[in-house]
Every structure is written in C-alpha cells, then in structure tokens.
Amino acid sequence: TRTHDGRPVRMLAVIDEYTRECLAIRAARTFKSHQVLELLAELFVLKGVPEHIRSDNGPEFTATAVRDWLKNVGAKTLFIEPGSPWENGYAESFNGKFRDELLNREIFYTLKEVQILTEMWRREYNTIRPHSSLGYRPPAPETFMPVVPEVAGLT
C-alpha cells in the first residue's frame, strides 16, 4: 500500500498458524532485520517461544541475524519455497482479507494513520470477525464477564 503522497508502506504481520490470531501487524516505510527481531522478542515474551516461524523469503527474515537469533531461542525457521504461496495459505488468506477489508478501501495520508487504522482492524479481526476455518468464530473473542449481583450479607 501507499500513502497519499505515493510513498510505499510495508506491512509485517505475525499470525498464529493454529489459532489464526493475528498477533501483530506493523506498518513502516521499510523493515530491517532488527525491527523483525524487536517484534518477535516482544511476542515471545508475551506468548512464549513457538516451535517454529514460517515465513516467505524476504530479506528481513532470511537475514543471518534473524536466523541466528531464532536458533538461539529455540525456534526453527521454515521458509516457504519461492513462488509457492499455497505453503502458507493461512497467511495468504489473511493478507487478502487485510487488503480487501482495509488497505484497498482507504486513502492513507500519513504512516501514523496507516498504523492506527491497521491496529483497529487487527483487533476487530481477532475479536469480532467470524472465521470460516474456525467454525465462524473469531480467533480471540473478547472475554465476556457477567455482572454478578451482590448477594445480601456476603459483602
């Protein structure tokens, strides 16, 4: 996608293969390997280290620093074959929905606007939007906390 001034915006999305939850989406003009490492480190602290990371062959993922760091924390790297998007169909499906439901519908004026609207979309995608592969449930529905009336004499 691009901002109104024609400058490109790159997206980095991290999706849980099992739950289909979008753990993070970052928007930036470019991505360097250190930015990928920062995001993965943040997610590993919050969610734990996964068994593997599956990605395309973008330079930000194939960088020696990223591969070495993942090996050191105990996560395997799985790269899809170039020209074989079906090897990570869940990610391709996600990217298509992301483009159709947000990126192709908006004219973005600033990178900050892209970042804010992307995070809003990600939260709706995870908590509200039904997913056919999950029996039309969202991957991370918001927790429902029932209101419990006070019981006389127990407060």
Task: List where the protein language model places each region.
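Short, basic/aromatic recognition patches
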Residues: T1-R7
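Short, acidic, Ser/Thr-enriched surface-loop or helix-capping motifs
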Residues: T3, D16-E17
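Active-site beta-loop-alpha junctions of metal-dependent nucleic acid enzymes
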Residues: R7-R10, I25-K47, P59
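Surface-exposed coil/loop segments, especially low-complexity Tyr/Gly/Ser/Thr-rich stretches
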Residues: M11-I15
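Hydrophobic "anchor" residues
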Residues: E21-C22
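RNase H-like two-metal-ion nuclease catalytic core shared by retroviral integrases
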Residues: I53-W69, T77-R99, T110-E119, P139-F144
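C-terminal domain-tail junction helix/linker
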Residues: V73, K97-T155
